[in-house]
């Protein structure tokens, strides 16, 4: 029950050649790469202004900007400088002698 030499060589050649089933996942990973790039581009694009002032759960999560401002409390606006607190001038009740 020996296999002829030609059949052995042909079976070796077919195992060395890339099969069509291995090329299909490459196409799928390219699709995943494109999807990943699309998600990243959405993350880095500037956020659009939203004038919604409601703080209910539905409004806090309806867009990314509202989630950052209302849900997490993060605001990147320019912070105003606080004015120095004025010291209260009190008259000395007992003069030092």
Curated annotation (Swiss-Prot):
Major subcellular site: host cell
Post-translational changes noted in the entry: The phosphorylation by CDK9 does not seem to be important for transactivation function.
Any Pfam family: Tat
Cellular compartments per GO CC: host cell nucleolus
A GO molecular-function annotation: RNA-binding transcription regulator activity
Gene3D superfamilies (alphabetical): Tat domain
GO process terms (BP): positive regulation of viral transcription
UniProt region (Cysteine-rich), positions on chain: 50-66
Extent of motif Nuclear localization signal, and RNA-binding (TAR): 78-88
Protein family according to the UniProt entry: Belongs to the lentiviruses Tat family.
Record comment regarding domains: The Arg-rich RNA-binding region binds the TAR RNA. This region also mediates the nuclear localization.
Name recorded for this polypeptide: Protein Tat
Organism this protein belongs to: Human immunodeficiency virus type 2 subtype B (isolate D205) (HIV-2)
Lineage: Viruses, Riboviria, Pararnavirae, Artverviricota, Revtraviricetes
């Amino acid at each position: 029950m020996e296999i002829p030499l030609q059949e052995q060589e042909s079976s070796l050649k077919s195992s060395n050649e890339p099969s069509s089933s291995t090329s299909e996942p490459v196409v799928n990973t390219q699709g995943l790469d494109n999807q990943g790039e699309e998600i990243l581009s959405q993350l880095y694009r500037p956020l659009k202004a939203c004038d919604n002032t409601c703080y209910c759960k539905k409004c806090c999560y309806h867009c990314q900007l509202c989630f950052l401002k209302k849900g997490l409390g993060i605001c990147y606006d320019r912070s105003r400088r606080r004015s120095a607190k004025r010291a209260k001038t009190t008259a000395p009740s007992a003069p030092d002698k």
